């Protein structure tokens, strides 16, 4: 498949930043303290996650990417920026001293995930006036906006971003989360998966009712399009 040329595209991505951390090693015994495997950790890898992973995917296509989000004032934020810089992504991170950078630690053995530990606290109650100011300034030099919502609080008020972008004639694509899609009204396109759509319209019995429900939701939210991804998560 031949992909279109994205080298001239300028994309502004706003959303929940995460660092995905993987510890891996062999398992050969059960802990004497509890009936759980003991992992002899021999490897560690950090990857951009959440909206940061979206930014990497878009940058890999050749687009010029600016990424806005909130993180802690900590080592994991530094690691995340370093990882993203290798993809020439312009990072506009707002560091919140009383928060940790959202980090998901997965313990792996023999290509299987044994455990996941989440280090996170919502950014929903954090003042976002500085982020909105930077967003408005960045709009003048981008072609399209992507809102990557993982319900971690950075996009607690997506309407303010959608309105600002649409006022400047920018298309807005939303990767939604949760059961309230009203907050994404008037976006250009939203891209829910099947489970996310069902959370809003209820489970559907057949393909015809699924399509009808999606079309009804598109109309009620005044969207230009609704792209349903065929996965459950």
Language-model features: locations:
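A short, aliphatic-rich alpha-helical micro-motif
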Residues: 6, 139-140, 184-185
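Structural motif
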Residues: 12-14, 116, 143-146, 173, ...
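Conserved phosphate-binding/catalytic loop of the ribokinase/pfkB sugar-kinase fold
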Residues: 93-99, 106-141
